[in-house]
C-alpha cells in the first residue's frame, strides 16, 4: 500500500499516511490514534471478509455488545459516514508504476426486515430462521478501478448475534465478494492484525503450515538469537506448542511457560512468513520484549519482510524500539534495508484531526535526538 486515508473512524476524525514503505513504524503519545490506524488498515484490506468487525472488536474487548456498530464511528456520530481509502502501486511496466485506489464508505442503516435469504453471501449456519426485527446493519459502498460504478453490500449480525452475514446489492457486488479485487490491490488485499495479546490458537495454525512447507528454519534462527538452547518447534494434536531445549531437558517445554518475549517474537515472525504478499499490522511491536531483544526483532522483521514480500505497519510506545531500529540500519550489513523503512509521528491537533510526519532513515536519528513524540 502506497498511501492510506481515513475519516470518521474510531478515534480518527481525519488522518492521512503517504509514501508508506515496506516496513513502517507509527509512534506518538497515548491517544494519538495509533491502534485506530491499524484497525482502519485492517478494514480496507479485508473489506469483503464478514469477520473484520469481530476481529477489531476483539482488540478492544467489545465482543460482548454484538448489535451496536456505533463504536466504529468517530465520536459515535453515525450521521457521518466512515471513509477509508488505500492507494496501491503495481509492478513496474515499461518504466511506469501503475497506481490504483480502493475506497470504502461505511454508513449505518436501520433495517426492520431482512433481505431475502437467497441473497445471503456468507453465513456459518444456513438454516438460521429469518429475523423479523433485524439489528442495524452497515452499508458498505466500494469504489474500485475495475468497475465504473460503486459496489454495495450490507454487513449485518446473524439472527443469534453470533457471526456476520454479507448481503450483496446486485450481481456485480456478488461477483466482487466471491472473486475479490482484480486490480493491483489484489496481492495486498490480505492483512493480519497482531494485538498485544498472544493468540496461541492462531499461532499453532500458522506454525503447522510453515512446518508442512518446511519453512520453520528461519523462525528457529531468530528464536536462537534469544535462547541458543532451542532446537526445534513441535505441535501437539491438542493445539499445544512445544519447544525442544535440548538434552538438558527431559521433556519438551510448552511455549506458554517461556517468557513473553519468545512468544511475541515467534508470533511476529510466524505472521510475516504465513502472509506472503500481504500486510502484517502489529500493535505495540515491542510488547513483552526486553530492550536487549529489540535488535534481534528488527533484524528478523527486516529480513522476513523482504523474503516474503510483506508490508509491515507497526506501532510502539517506546523510543527504544525506534533507537534500536536506527542502530540496526546503521550497521553496514543492513544498509540494503535503509530505503525500505519509514517512521511516522502521529500528533493530535487542536481540531482533533491527527497529523502524520514522515521520517526516512536519514531523518530518524535527528528526529530521536530532537524529541520525536513517544510516551517516554
Predicted regions and their residues:
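Switch/communication elements of ASCE P-loop NTPase nucleotide-binding domains
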Residues: 1-55, 249-375
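Phosphate-coordinating catalytic segments in nucleotide- and nucleic-acid-processing enzymes
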Residues: 47-273, 341-376
